[in-house]
UniProtKB/Swiss-Prot annotation:
Keywords: Amino-acid biosynthesis, Aromatic amino acid biosynthesis, NADP, Oxidoreductase
Key word Oxidoreductase present: yes
Annotated source species: Bacillus thuringiensis subsp. konkukian (strain 97-27)
This protein's GO CC annotations: cytosol
Highest taxon, organism lineage: Bacteria
EC number: 1.1.1.25
InterPro entries to which the protein is assigned, alphabetical: Aminoacid_DH-like_N_sf, NAD(P)-bd_dom_sf, SDH_C, Shikimate_DH, Shikimate_DH-bd_N, Shikimate_DH_fam, Shikm_DH/Glu-tRNA_Rdtase
Pathway: Metabolic intermediate biosynthesis; chorismate biosynthesis; chorismate from D-erythrose 4-phosphate and phosphoenolpyruvate: step 4/7
Alphabetical list of HAMAP family matching this protein: Shikimate_DH_AroE (MF_00222)
Listed Pfam families: SDH_C, Shikimate_DH, Shikimate_dh_N
Residues the record lists as binding shikimate: 15-17, 62, 87, 102, 221
Statement: the UniProt record of this protein carries the keyword Oxidoreductase: yes
Functional summary from the UniProt entry: Involved in the biosynthesis of the chorismate, which leads to the biosynthesis of aromatic amino acids. Catalyzes the reversible NADPH linked reduction of 3-dehydroshikimate (DHSA) to yield shikimate (SA).
The protein, known as: Shikimate dehydrogenase (NADP(+))
Length: 277
């Protein structure tokens, strides 16, 4: 019998997940289908119970349900619980189990372009919202020991740091101070929506004095190269946009559901084509 997978969110029509996962199923000759389900906030509980009753094998969760979904699951992975958000659900032995592959997917994406272990790197996170939280906790879980957080509201950066139980040396910074100290970091990660289309002229941090070999990663993929990435590229940095994070988090969810490892490069090229690259 064909296995059913999907993604729930509102809006959902723009999602690239169905294209990516259905291509992977076809490429691996798997009898499965991935569908996008429009689910409004007021019927989330009913939708989750319905998906469970239908025997869905697993599904992704996107905006605005990543936090609210946690109330309707049977179990939640410890890392997802610490992050406070779920983006992947596995239906196993009659239970819906919630995970967060956003942060781990980002860490895997970052490792794919780093010639050295991330554990040895000094990292600066820009932003202290949900995406930053997932990435911060996942980097800490991966053994990174030095992660500073810069945010427009410094108190929010302090709250993020204080919530982590792992042994990490972290300092909360203003964006102004981070701008001055940018040359002391090995990796800079931009996790906010600043610079996203259509406000492409904006940047949270003016890149001006990076050290050689710095990696600058932005979770935005529209545009492919944000202002911060363009400036970093001019400084000779290794740059990475949000496509890698999107693909790696999706590939990890695919692996959790099926036990099969999809072709990452195939997924990435498909997403780039769909985005018009």
């Amino acid at each position: 019998m064909k296995q059913l997978y999907g993604v729930i969110g509102n809006p959902i029509g723009h999602s690239l997940s169905p294209v990516m996962h259905n291509d992977a199923f076809e490429h691996l000759n798997m009898d499965a289908h991935y569908h996008a389900f429009l689910v409004k906030e007021e019927v989330l509980g009913e939708a989750v119970r319905g998906l469970k009753a239908l025997g869905i094998s697993g599904f992704n969760v996107t905006t605005p349900h990543k936090v609210a979904i946690m109330d309707y699951l049977d179990e939640i992975d410890p890392l997802a619980k610490q992050i406070g958000a779920v983006n992947t659900v596995v239906h196993k032995d009659g239970k819906l189990i919630g995970y967060n592959t956003d942060g781990i997917g980002f860490v895997r994406a970052l490792q794919s372009i780093s010639s050295e272990p991330l554990q040895e790197k000094r990292i600066l996170l820009l932003g202290a919202g949900g995406a930053s939280r997932a990435i911060y906790f996942s980097l800490a879980d991966a053994g990174v020991k030095e992660i500073d957080v810069a945010n427009r509201t410094v108190d929010k950066a302090k709250e993020l740091i204080a919530a982590c139980t792992a042994t990490v040396h972290s300092v909360a910074l203003s964006l102004e101070k981070a701008t001055k100290e940018q040359g002391s970091y090995d990796i800079i990660i931009q996790t906010t929506t600043i610079g996203m289309h259509p406000r492409v002229e904006h940047t949270p941090l003016q890149i001006s004095s990076l050290k050689k070999g710095t990696i600058v990663s932005d979770i935005i993929y529209n545009p492919f190269e944000t202002k911060i990435l363009c400036e970093a590229k001019e400084q000779g940095a290794i740059i990475q946009n949000g496509i890698d994070m999107f693909v790696y988090q999706g590939a990890l969810a695919f692996e959790m559901w099926t036990g099969c490892v999809p072709n990452i490069e195939r997924m990435k090229q498909l997403v780039i084509r769909k985005l018009g690259g």
